[in-house]
Structures are given as structure tokens and as C-alpha cells.
A protein has these predicted regions:
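SAM-dependent transferase fold signal centered on methyltransferase-like domains
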Residues: 2-432
């Protein structure tokens, strides 16, 4: 049973008169035990991992603050909204999608919020006021919220391409201390193939670099940093996630009030094509850009990308909190364990991703990563095993970790020439 709000065109709500819903004929999908129908909406099963991350931090936020009001401005079939409602136990979820054909489908999926869970004995009137559906332009919805001072704990903007129009309004419609979940699928800008598009959409001039997929995350965060600064706010990433299908770049940001932009984590990345060394540069050091390698300098041998985010991609404490909650929910049991809603494969992937995010959060790691095959190519040696190489780097006092973006790479503050030297002393077998 759905609920139709009679007071406005195109607005459906759980807080009004009940009307029967038209049936949507579609095979039922399931994520982590939550069933839903897709209908004519776009749905990608591979993105369920990113939805897992969003649900976990939403639940952690509710535990920490006692409040979770969610605005999902590009809902599609509503799988994210339903999971926020049922799994993160959101107090209220507003699901919006501009497509008129999805309204009944959204209502059908969100009506699961009226069902009794295993521990509930009764449903009060407030349980029927936990969700709302609209079919408005996402940009308009966000601006209206800011104008009415109707702020949310978490705003999910699942956009595609290089559409950053909603980034600023989303930051303006979230509570101080709240979360904004941003998405981009602009692999061409991340790869430096559309530099002027990147400049207009993200405020960064992006040159081709060998860690393009990390650039995709950093330019998206950098865009949010710039938008927040114009509103006397700051944003810092709770976690950032790259997925190869698409590609898809996602980041969950914490929004705080601050009157001045602190630019230590907002700057430029410099890369030397001759030696393969990259470094982070502050605004104050732009006039001193150079590479200290012994190779003769040629025009274009040193390239600069930015301004963008050059700080940590994740908040270690928050990711550890997400990990603990995922373990409590049985989402990351040991491989081989299985619950009704979790396959061993899903559990292993989520567990490994959270572990790598914690590794990537260690202090001292710069932007970018070094692919193992590049070390072998530049040093003219067989490629060392990644794990052995990371152990060797840490023994030498360098920060080093895996990369969740590129499994054949390491993140380290060790200079490239030292990486090559250490590569000679590591176990020389080809990485699989």
C-alpha cells in the first residue's frame, strides 16, 4: 500500500492518504537481505559494494549522533533509500527522482519500511512517516532545502558523467557535521583527455598521469572543497572508493563549518615523465616546481595537475568503525562462513576493501601510487612481489601500503630511484 500526498503535484509521501499502487512486473533483486524491484530504472549489481559502504557509515553516524535523516536526490529504483531505511535505521528518508515512471516503483520498494522487523511487536503512527517520494529536479530539491533551512544528516548524490551541478547545493543542504556522498563517472577527465572540461566541471586542470583513477577521486573531492569554501565550510573525506566498472569515483565527505580554507590538503600534483617521480605541491611552492632527478629536462617532461585534494582519501577511525559494524552485522565473516544474505565472495571483497582503506590512511603517504611493473621497467629488473616490496619499504622507514585502486601498485613516500634500488634487493618474481 502506498501513500499519495494530495497537497502538491508530483509529491508522494508516507504521511497522507493510502491509495493502491500499480503493480510493477520485475524479478525481485536482493542486496544484503533487502529485497527490491528494479523495474525500468538503471541498476548495476556491481555497485552494491559502494552501497554497503554508504549504509555502514550512515549507521555509524546514527550511533554517534542519535540522528539520521537522509535525502537521496537521484534515487532510481530506490535501492539506496530502502537500505538506508531498513539497514541504517534512518529516522527519515526522502527519495527523489525526476523520472515520472519510477514513482510507483519507489513507493512499492520503500513501503517495506512499514513491515515489522524481527524484534518489533507493534508499529506506531511515526513508523508511517519515515519516508517521502518526490519527482523533482535534484538541483531544485537541494536549493529548496537550503532556502527552507531543512538540513539533512546525509545527502546522497548518485550522479553520472561530469555533472557537478549538485555538489555545492548538497553541501549547502546538509547539517554541520553531516555527510555528503558524491559520485562521478568521468574517466576521460580523470585521464587528462578533457582538460578544459575538468577545469570547468571540477576546477582542476588535469594532465595525463599514470595514476589517473586516483586523480578521478581527488578532483571530485577537490571540487567539493572549492564549493564548500565559498560557503564558509570545509569537507574532509570519510572514505573514497574507485570501481573499475564505469569507471565510478565515489567519496563520502564530512561537512563542517569553517570560515577559512586550510589549503595544506588542497594543492597540486607534479609528475616527472623522465624518472617517474611524483610529488604534492602547495600553492606557495608553485614557483619552485622542479624534479631533482639526474635526467636532462625537456619541455613537457614535468607536468602539473590541480588544484585538487592532496590529503588522505579516508578517515582511519571512521573506517575502523565501519569495519567493526560490518563484523557485528555478519557482513565480513571469514571466507567460507555464510549467512542468509551474505555470500562468502561478498564478505571477502568488503573485508579486503576496508582493510586496504585502513592501510591507505596511514600518515605520510602522498598522492598517487607506483605500479610494480614500472619499477621493473625503469630498473630493468624482474618485478618484485608486492607484499615483499612493501615489507622492505617499511623496514627502511618509508610509509607504504596497498592501493584499493590498482592491485598491482603500492602507495609510498619512497622516491622512485630508491624504489628501484630496493627492488633489486627484494625477492624477484613476477607479480601475478
Amino acid at each position: 500500500m502506498g501513500y499519495l500526498q494530495m497537497g502538491g503535484i508530483g509529491t508522494f509521501s508516507a504521511m497522507a492518504l493510502p491509495v493502491p499502487l500499480a503493480p510493477v512486473k520485475m524479478l525481485i533483486q536482493e542486496e544484503r537481505g533487502v529485497s527490491f524491484q528494479v523495474g525500468p530504472a538503471f541498476y548495476r549489481r556491481q555497485s552494491s559494494l559502494a552501497r554497503d559502504l554508504g549504509i555502514l557509515i550512515a549507521a555509524v553516524h546514527r550511533q554517534q549522533t542519535g540522528s539520521l535523516r537522509v535525502l537521496d536526490v537521484m534515487s532510481g529504483c530506490g535501492v539506496r533509500a530502502v537500505r538506508y531505511l531498513l539497514q541504517a535505521r534512518a529516522d527519515f528518508v526522502w527519495a527523489n527522482d525526476a523520472c515520472n515512471q519510477l514513482t510507483d516503483l519507489l513507493a512499492q520498494n520503500l513501503s517495506q519500511g512499514h513491515s515489522l522487523d524481527e524484534k518489533s511487536e507493534a508499529v506506531g503512527e511515526e513508523d508511517f512517516e519515515r519516508w517521502r517520494i518526490t519527482r523533482e529536479d535534484a538541483h531544485k530539491v537541494l536549493l529548496d532545502c537550503a532556502l527552507r533551512k531543512e538540513y539533512y544528516d546525509l545527502i546522497d548524490v548518485d550522479s553520472f558523467g561530469s555533472d557537478t551541478l549538485c555538489v555545492g547545493p548538497a553541501i549547502g543542504a546538509v547539517k554541520y557535521g553531516g555527510l555528503v556522498y558524491l559520485t562521478s563517472t568521468d574517466g576521460l577527465c580523470a585521464g587528462g583527455r578533457r582538460r578544459h572540461n575538468a577545469l570547468s566541471s571540477y576546477g582542476a586542470f588535469v594532465n595525463p598521469m599514470p595514476f589517473a583513477n586516483e586523480i578521478g577521486l581527488r578532483m571530485l573531492i577537490g571540487c567539493a572543497v572549492r564549493e564548500a569554501a565559498t560557503r564558509n565550510m570545509t569537507v574532509t573525506p570519510i572514505f573514497s572508493n574507485y570501481a573499475y566498472h564505469g569507471p565510478v569515483f565515489r567519496t563520502m565527505l564530512r561537512v563542517e563549518s569553517r570560515k577559512r580554507l586550510v589549503n595544506k590538503d588542497y594543492g597540486f600534483i607534479v609528475y616527472c615523465k623522465r624518472c617517474g617521480q611524483s610529488q604534492d605541491i602547495q600553492f606557495e611552492d608553485l614557483g619552485d616546481i622542479a624534479c631533482c632527478c639526474a635526467y636532462p629536462k625537456e619541455k613537457g617532461s614535468v607536468v602539473v595537475t590541480g588544484p585538487l585534494w592532496i590529503g588522505p582519501l579516508h578517515d582511519r577511525n571512521q573506517v575502523e568503525g565501519m569495519t567493526e559494524l560490518a563484523r557485528e552485522w555478519g557482513w565480513i565473516n571469514s571466507v567460507g562462513a555464510r549467512s542468509i544474505s551474505n555470500s562468502p565472495v561478498d564478505m571477502h571483497i568488503l573485508k579486503e576493501l576496508l582493510e586496504v582503506m585502513v592501510d591507505e590512511s596511514q600518515p605520510g603517504l602522498p598522492s598517487g601510487y607506483v605500479r610494480m611493473d614500472q619499477i621493473g621497467k625503469r630498473g630493468k629488473v624482474r618485478v618484485p612481489r608486492r607484499k615483499d616490496f612493501i615489507d622492505r619499504l617499511q623496514q627502511e622507514g618509508y610509509a607504504a601500503s596497498r592501493s584499493h585502486i590498482e592491485p598491482r601498485a603500492v602507495k609510498t613516500n619512497c622516491p622512485m630511484d630508491q624504489c628501484i634500488e630496493l627492488g633489486y634487493g627484494s625477492r624477484s618474481i613476477v607479480i601475478q
